[in-house]
């Protein structure tokens, strides 16, 4: 019944019974778990997974290989929330109840957990966040130095390097054109 609901599914995409998939969603070969909510106009690209009870907003792009965590295994207190218009780059991982606010862009390979430092480096002083990415932020993988008993080592983090601009929108606009003109990909 996907076609009647205006949902485009490319086999072997799977959405478990109990997941909500809205009109206009495109599921490339991907997996959407029980209790997940995927809102209209969203693209779940090849080999992306949407975990149990995750909340994905309108017009989101989950690129190839993205992993959006669920709440069932391991048990989590809060779902991952990806707000409207966000772009999640290839092979990103977003788990443990992290919230990505409206129109944020995560570059390829960003890994966000509840304890990952998300450091805004755009100003004269860094600003640290944990558990959420501010709206329209552009985020890339990074690292910071941490002292351990055995010495100083690099620990992964995420760096906010700017805000979404028209040039960013242009890079992500192909997705919108494909949806608007109902082009099968």
Region annotations inferred by a language model:
Residues 1-7, 136-137, 141-185:
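Terminal amphipathic alpha-helical/low-complexity segments used for targeting or macromolecular assembly
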Residues 7-147:
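Structural signal for interior beta-strand "rungs" in well-ordered beta-sheet cores
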């Amino acid at each position: 019944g996907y076609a009647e609901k205006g949902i485009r599914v490319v086999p072997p995409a799977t959405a478990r019974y109990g997941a909500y998939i809205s009109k206009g969603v495109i599921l490339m070969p991907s997996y959407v778990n029980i209790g997940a909510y995927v809102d209209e106009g969203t693209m779940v690209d090849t080999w992306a997974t949407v975990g149990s009870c995750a909340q994905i907003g309108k017009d989101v792009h989950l690129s190839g290989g993205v992993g959006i965590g669920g709440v069932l295994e391991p048990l989590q207190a809060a779902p991952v929330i990806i707000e409207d218009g966000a772009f999640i780059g290839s092979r990103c991982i977003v788990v443990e109840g992290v919230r990505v606010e409206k129109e944020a862009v995560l570059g390829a390979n960003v890994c966000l957990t509840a304890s990952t430092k998300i450091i805004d480096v755009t100003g004269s002083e860094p600003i640290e966040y944990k558990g959420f990415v501010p709206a329209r932020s552009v985020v890339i993988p990074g690292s910071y130095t941490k002292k351990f008993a055995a010495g100083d080592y690099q620990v992964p983090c995420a760096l906010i390097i700017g805000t979404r601009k028209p040039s960013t929108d242009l890079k992500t606009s192909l997705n919108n054109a494909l949806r608007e003109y109902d082009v099968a990909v």
